Curated annotation (Swiss-Prot):
Residues 34-46, 127-140 have a biased composition (Low complexity). The modification N-acetylalanine is found at A2. It comes from Danio rerio (Zebrafish). The gene is cdv3. Residues 51-67 have a biased composition (Basic and acidic residues). InterPro entries: CDV3. Its main location: cytoplasm. This is Protein CDV3 homolog. GO terms for cellular component: cytoplasm. It comes from the Eukaryota.
Length: 236
């Protein structure tokens, strides 16, 4: 009986530990299911957020492209610059001419002061059809100003007497002139001129191909002895 009791105790212990392990496994399974369910629930809004972000980025890109296309057709608007520090004013172009009149005091012949109104815009660049100047204005005296003399430059006596002569105006070149445009055929149709005659006095003009040298004329031909001078020696 003593041996049987410990065996029953061991079985009861094994059953106890087996039940405890089953409980632990069940608790672990429930915990995993809860974790997976929570993870899935957390993942759903993340996916929705990603989709919403993608949609928003696409819409922003489309809006940016539309704005760029609109900017190409926008008219240029000049920005107003503050010139107060530089003491300058912005120029404003207007179609109508704004002429401001001012009064000018002039002294007449009798010493009376005359007020003359004139336009600021008038001048040599903007002539307006106004009245001619009044005759009451005093005549302006012309003062002769002596012309300044050029500084003295030394010139040699020969250069002082020489005067610059204008060369005669040359006309167009004569194309058919042999003197200006000589050719090979000019000797065949050569016409004697006064200049050629003067040249003949100092130079000999060759006009023929065959030229007789000096000392080779017909009068200077030597008489040659053509007979045999040694014939006398043969008779002996």
């Amino acid at each position: 009986m003593a041996d049987v009791a410990p065996a029953g105790v061991e079985k009861s212990l094994d059953d106890f530990f087996a039940k405890r392990d089953k409980k632990k496994k069940k608790e672990k399974g429930k915990g995993k299911e809860q974790v997976t369910g929570a993870a899935a629930a957390a993942a759903m809004p993340v996916k929705k957020m990603k989709k919403e972000k993608e949609k928003s980025t696409k819409s922003e890109n489309q809006d940016a492209q539309m704005e760029k296309e609109d900017e190409e057709w926008k008219e240029f608007e000049q920005k107003e610059v503050d010139y107060t520090g530089l003491r300058l004013q912005a120029m404003q172009m207007s179609d109508e001419k704004e002429e401001e009149e001012y009064e000018k005091e002039e002294v007449g012949e009798d010493g009376e002061i005359i007020l003359v109104t004139s336009d600021k815009m008038s001048g040599p660049w903007n002539k307006s059809g106004g009245a001619p100047p009044s005759a009451a204005s005093a005549p302006v005296e012309e003062v002769e100003v002596p012309e300044p003399k050029a500084p003295g430059v030394y010139r040699p006596p020969g250069a002082r007497l020489t005067t610059t002569k204008k060369a005669p105006a040359q006309g167009p070149p004569e194309i058919f002139s042999d003197a200006q445009f000589p050719s090979l055929l000019s000797t065949a149709r050569h016409v004697e001129t006064r200049k050629d005659r003067e040249m003949e006095k100092t130079f000999e003009v060759v006009k023929h191909k065959s030229r007789v040298r000096e000392g080779e004329g017909p009068g200077s031909m030597q008489q040659l002895q053509l007979d045999n001078q040694y014939a006398i020696l043969g008779d002996k």
